[in-house]
Regions:
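Bacterial N-terminal signal peptides that target proteins for export
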Residues: 1-6
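N-terminal secretory/targeting leader peptides
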Residues: 11, 22-110, 130-332
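Sec/Tat signal peptide C-region and signal peptidase I cleavage site
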Residues: 15-21
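Cleavable N-terminal signal peptides
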Residues: 8-9, 19
């Protein structure tokens, strides 16, 4: 009887110790669950929770309904939540270096290999007190989408006169300084209603996700070439990261690196499927050509770099990493 009781105590103690040893990481995501990018992040969560059984688990608390999308980066810095999946552009004021990802023509796989992501991680830790775990869903760029047929001038350049163009922090510098557009800043969650009411009639958006958001109900034209890159990343409160066991950190980092590659490949296929569906439903593609296309792309890149350099110069750390970031994130 004594032996049985002692064995039971040992078993209970072992179970309690194991339960205590399992790390839990709380997380939120910037966009609604219906969006393809959120689905990608939730796939990453599932992969971690499978690989991390008994070691580390991610507990998703929700999306913008739990913490506002623009408040999420500050929430992870403050430790209100441990992990956030969000565009770097949502915390551009704290880290202008995120523009290296926005203007990049490389993928996470390439910049992981050449040291670019390691540098971005170092900058995140220094400036924001967060660990930059991974750049997910890279390799997808942006298009300008319009309700009405776009106007081109005599040189084939896009004329945005009269467009009610929805803007945001990702592409405002390009839209205002090169295109000369007057933008109306709106969060993603308000764009459908704005299109429906005619508040805006054009927007920048990534190559995929238009169908998920149902904006294709109002937008009829896609303008090529595409520009920029998605800058969707997963950041973790640095104090929380350092408190995790070494095994937990290894699992999280290894799964993140694998998901960088897997998500990039998967979303490339989704893009092709979305384009086919949209064009089958009647969407028309307007392509800038020759010098007009080159000027359009060059302006998108240079205006973003200029913005990054100017904001970096204003920070205490200065713009010493500017040239290195361009070298690592842009192939000329």
């Amino acid at each position: 009887m004594k032996h049985t009781l002692f064995a039971g105590i040992l078993a209970t103690t072992a179970m309690t110790t194991a339960a205590m040893a399992e790390d839990t990481v709380t997380a939120v995501h910037a966009f609604p669950e219906s969006l393809i990018y959120t689905k990608s992040f939730l796939e990453f969560v599932d992969k971690v929770n499978e690989a991390g059984k008994g070691v580390v688990q991610i507990e998703v608390r929700g999306g913008p309904e739990a913490i506002g999308m623009f408040q999420q980066p500050d929430a992870v810095r403050a430790g209100v939540v441990d992990m956030v999946y969000t565009p770097g552009s949502f915390y551009a004021g704290a880290l202008p270096e995120k523009d290296a990802l926005v203007a990049s023509n490389l993928t996470a796989v390439e910049t992981r290999a050449n040291g670019g992501i390691a540098l971005i991680d170092e900058i995140h830790q220094e400036k924001m007190g967060v660990k930059y775990l991974g750049w997910f869903d890279s390799g997808v760029c942006y298009n300008l989408w319009t309700r009405d047929a776009p106007t081109l001038d005599a040189g084939g350049n896009l004329d945005v006169t009269g467009l009610k163009l929805r803007g945001n922090a990702v592409y405002n510098a390009f839209f205002t300084e090169y295109l000369g557009a007057q933008v109306i800043d709106l969060p993603t969650t308000e764009v459908y209603s704005a299109l429906e009411r005619g508040v805006v009639d054009a927007t920048g958006w990534t190559q995929i996700g238009l169908i998920d958001l149902k904006w294709n109900e109002f937008l009829n034209y896609r303008i090529e070439p595409c520009f920029f890159s998605t800058d969707l990343g997963t950041i973790v409160n640095l104090e929380k990261w350092n408190s995790l066991s070494e095994e937990s950190r290894t699992i999280l980092q290894d799964v993140a690196i694998a998901h960088e590659a897997e998500s990039s490949a998967k979303l490339g296929a989704v893009r092709d499927e979305d384009f086919a569906k949209l064009e089958e439903a009647g969407m028309e593609v307007i392509t800038l050509e020759g010098d007009a296309a080159e000027a359009y792309l060059a302006a998108a890149t240079q205006n973003t770099w200029d913005r990054m350099k100017g904001l970096m110069a204003e920070s205490p750390q200065g713009d010493g990493n500017y040239d290195k970031l361009i070298e690592l994130f842009y192939k000329k």
